[in-house]
C-alpha cells in the first residue's frame, strides 16, 4: 500500500509539473504578445528583464539547494551567452512582428536547421527517415507564411534570424554541456548574468533608455507589473522544463511539447483574432505531421541504440 501511495504521489507531482509547464509556456507567448501590442514595451529591454529575473531566480534556487552551481571559466561561455541574447531577442522580435501562428510555425524550422548545421559542421549523419520528415515541416511553414494575410517582410527576416540563432544556440548548448560536464541549470546560472551584461551595454544603442518608450521611461503601473510578471513566468518556464526533463521520459517531454504547440496555435487565433485561411490550416497540419513523425523516428532510433548497448557483451 505504501508503494502504491508513493506512486500516486509521484504521478501527482509529475502531473502538477506538466500542468505548470503547460500554463507558463503558453502564458509567456500570449503575455509577451500582449505587452508588445498594448504597451509597446521595447523588445531588447524586455529580454534584459527576463535575463535578470531568471538569474535572480536561479540564485535563489541554488541557495535552496535545488541545484549545485559549478565553477565555469567565463571565456568558454562568451559565444554561448552572445547567442543566448540573439536567440531570445530575435524570437521575441518575430513574435512582435508576426501573427502567433506564423511565429509558432517558424520555430518548427529549428529542427531542420539544426540537422543541417550538425551535418555540415559536425559531420553527424541522420537516417533517411529523419531527413524525409523535414519535407512536411518545411512545406507546412512555407504554406502558412505564403497564405498569411498579415505576412510582412520584416517579420519574416526576424523569424529567419531567430531560427538560425536558436539552432546555433541549441547545438552549442549540447556541446558545452558535454564539454564542461554541467546540466542546463548550471549552464544557465552563468549564461544569464553574462547575457544580461551584454544586453545592458547594447540596449542604449538600439532603444531609448530614459525617454518615452524606453525601459526607464514613464510607464503605467499596469505595464510595469505585466513586464515583471513576464520575467517571472520566463524563469518558471526554464525551471519547469528542467524539472520535466529530470523527472519524465523523453517521450513524455516531446509529446507534451506537441500538445503545447497545438494549444498555442489555437489560443493565438482566439485571443488575438488572427485570420486563418484553409491553406494556412493545411500548412499547420503538414508541419505538425512532420514534427510528430520526426519525434517518432528519433525516439525509436534512440531506443534501438540503448537496446544494442544493453545486449552488447
Curated annotation (Swiss-Prot):
List the membrane topology term(s): Multi-pass membrane protein
Q: Where in the cell is it found?
A: Membrane
The record's Pfam families line, in alphabetical order, gives:
TPT
**One annotated GO molecular function:** antiporter activity
Record carries keyword Mitochondrion: no
Covalent S-S links between cysteines: none
One Gene Ontology CC term in the entry: membrane
Q: Which UniProt keywords apply?
A: Membrane, Transmembrane, Transmembrane helix
For the biological process aspect of GO, one term held by this record is: transmembrane transport
- Transmembrane feature ranges: 17-37, 40-60, 77-97, 100-120, 130-147, 153-173, 187-206, 225-245, 252-272, 275-295
The protein's matches in SUPFAM superfamilies, at most eight in alphabetical order, are given as: Multidrug resistance efflux transporter EmrE
Q: Which family does it belong to?
A: Belongs to the TPT transporter family. SLC35E subfamily.
Function comment = Putative transporter.
What this protein is called in its record is Solute carrier family 35 member E3
Q: Which organism is it from?
A: Bos taurus (Bovine)
The coding gene here is SLC35E3
Amino acid at each position: 500500500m505504501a508503494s502504491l501511495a508513493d506512486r500516486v504521489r509521484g504521478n501527482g507531482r509529475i502531473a502538477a509539473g506538466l500542468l505548470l509547464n503547460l500554463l507558463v509556456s503558453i502564458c509567456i507567448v500570449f503575455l509577451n504578445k500582449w505587452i508588445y501590442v498594448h504597451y509597446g514595451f521595447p523588445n531588447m529591454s524586455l529580454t534584459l528583464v527576463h535575463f535578470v529575473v531568471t538569474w535572480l531566480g536561479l540564485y535563489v534556487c541554488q541557495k535552496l539547494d535545488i541545484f549545485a552551481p559549478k565553477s565555469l571559466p567565463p571565456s568558454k561561455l562568451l559565444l554561448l551567452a552572445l547567442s543566448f541574447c540573439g536567440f531570445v531577442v530575435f524570437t521575441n522580435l518575430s513574435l512582435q512582428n508576426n501573427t502567433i501562428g506564423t511565429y509558432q510555425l517558424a520555430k518548427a524550422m529549428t529542427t531542420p536547421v539544426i540537422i543541417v548545421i550538425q551535418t555540415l559542421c559536425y559531420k553527424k549523419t541522420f537516417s533517411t527517415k529523419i531527413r524525409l520528415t523535414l519535407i512536411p515541416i518545411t512545406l507546412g511553414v512555407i504554406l502558412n507564411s505564403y497564405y498569411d494575410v498579415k505576412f510582412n517582410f520584416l517579420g519574416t527576416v526576424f523569424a529567419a534570424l531567430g531560427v538560425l540563432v536558436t539552432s546555433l544556440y541549441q547545438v552549442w548548448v549540447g556541446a558545452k554541456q558535454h564539454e564542461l560536464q554541467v546540466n542546463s541549470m548550471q549552464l544557465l546560472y552563468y549564461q544569464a548574468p553574462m547575457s544580461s551584461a551584454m544586453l545592458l551595454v547594447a540596449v542604449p544603442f538600439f532603444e531609448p533608455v530614459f525617454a518615452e518608450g524606453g525601459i526607464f521611461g514613464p510607464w503605467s503601473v499596469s505595464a510595469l507589473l505585466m513586464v515583471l510578471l513576464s520575467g517571472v513566468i520566463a524563469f518558471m518556464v526554464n525551471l519547469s522544463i528542467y524539472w520535466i526533463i529530470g523527472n519524465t521520459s523523453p517521450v513524455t517531454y516531446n509529446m507534451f511539447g506537441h500538445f503545447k504547440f497545438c494549444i498555442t496555435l489555437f489560443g493565438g487565433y482566439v485571443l488575438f483574432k488572427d485570420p486563418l485561411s484553409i491553406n494556412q490550416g493545411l500548412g499547420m497540419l503538414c508541419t505538425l505531421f512532420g514534427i510528430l513523425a520526426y519525434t517518432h523516428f528519433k525516439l525509436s532510433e534512440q531506443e534501438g541504440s540503448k537496446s544494442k548497448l544493453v545486449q552488447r557483451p
